[in-house]
Amino acid sequence: MASVGVAPTSGFREVLGDGEIGVDDILPEEMSDMKIRDDREMEATVVDGNGTETGHIIVTTIGGRNGQPKQTISYMAERVVGHGSFGVVFQAKCLETGETVAIKKVLQDKRYKNRELQTMRLLDHPNVVSLKHCFFSTTEKDELYLNLVLEYVPETVHRVIKHYSKLNQRMPMIYVKLYTYQIFRALSYIHRCIGVCHRDIKPQNLLVNPHTHQVKLCDFGSAKVLVKGEPNISYICSRYYRAPELIFGATEYTTAIDVWSVGCVLAELLLGQPLFPGERGVDQLVEIIKVLGTPTREEIKCMNPNYTEFKFPQIKAHPWHKIFHKRMPAEAVDLVSRLLQYSPNLRCQALDCLTHPFFDELRDPNARLPTGRFLPPLFNFKPHELKGVPVETLMKLVPEHARKQCPFLGL
């Protein structure tokens, strides 16, 4: 990791992490001091201002370990593209290469490792935003900031939905299929290969290249390895996309919360607006009950056993085909219904979703974007993505014309 000195960024004092600190997250004091000293070894220029304003230049060094030569890299901040309690994300240009990157700057508690950085270092997938490198920056008040240098993707699924909504148009179905398929592929990878639950799937965290329509999952600030038997906080995930077990306050949830969130995103792509709008948890539960009906005692037990005696208003489920317009493909409605189940264990798993008939059009060798361009890469699986997958699933998953991309399958 490299180091940099920049002047203060005000206003971001929220301690990172979510209160779920394990033994592995804590740095011993002497190691913590040593690590930070090591990372400040090549102190870069201290920049006036907060380093995120247009025109500010941040100079850092990378390499210098395992025999690699040290390199100086300069980034010119261009504009802020996102901010929140975590800190700020800004677009920057590398002056040496001309490459545009996104830099996520977060306040770092010196006592703990940064879980987002630990997670990002494990990730390598075409549908997950990639970490290029990272560096620390310090302020005059000796606050430590972690800067994650990420690949830059210009659009979000949220803005694409807004675009069609403003035009009063439905999103072309090929885009709905493409975006949802790629989200499931990213989820299958992080759930099965890395063992991580994202915990904040929403259209704003789904980046999209407007030319190729390749989608990348971003923002692993809430992501966590879920260990069976270990409690997790339930106040996680953004409103509209929160699984009902989270609204019920469950602390022993599974990666099925991400699958519920994708169900909400898919419904929003189809409808042009959120399926379960609600400002507070109770409002959202009401919206969910209006669609799925009152959960049965057994379903409540699956979500949070402490609520089985709670008296809910008895409401019948609203048929899915009445929620969507008449011309909605039956496969789309079927997939939504398999994702938005009260019982987490009944929700379709991400890998199985990829073989759903809704995505059959994407497996057609003649499928093209409305512009006439080829589809983005959808079948360039790596061996670890498909480890342990039954042959019959593989046959459905990788169409014949794409099998040369996966020679390790021996199909």
Curated annotation (Swiss-Prot):
Protein name: Glycogen synthase kinase-3 homolog MsK-1
Positions of transmembrane segments: none
Family per record: Belongs to the protein kinase superfamily. CMGC Ser/Thr protein kinase family. GSK-3 subfamily.
Residue ranges constituting the Protein kinase domain according to the UniProt record: 75-359
GO cellular component: cytoplasm; nucleus
Tissue specificity as recorded in UniProt: Leaves, petioles, roots, stems and nodes.
Keyword Disulfide bond in record: no
Gene field: MSK-1
One BP annotation, GO: signal transduction
Catalytic activity: L-seryl-[protein] + ATP = O-phospho-L-seryl-[protein] + ADP + H(+); L-threonyl-[protein] + ATP = O-phospho-L-threonyl-[protein] + ADP + H(+)
Active site per database record: 200 (proton acceptor)
UniProt cross-references to Gene3D superfamilies, sorted A to Z: Phosphorylase Kinase, domain 1, Transferase(Phosphotransferase) domain 1
Native species: Medicago sativa (Alfalfa)
GO terms assigned for molecular function: ATP binding; protein serine kinase activity; protein serine/threonine kinase activity
The protein's enzyme class: transferase
Pfam families: Pkinase
Positions of modified residues (Phosphotyrosine): 235
Keywords: ATP-binding, Kinase, Nucleotide-binding, Phosphoprotein, Serine/threonine-protein kinase, Transferase
Residues bound to ATP: 81-89, 104
EC number: 2.7.11.1
Protein origin, superkingdom: Eukaryota
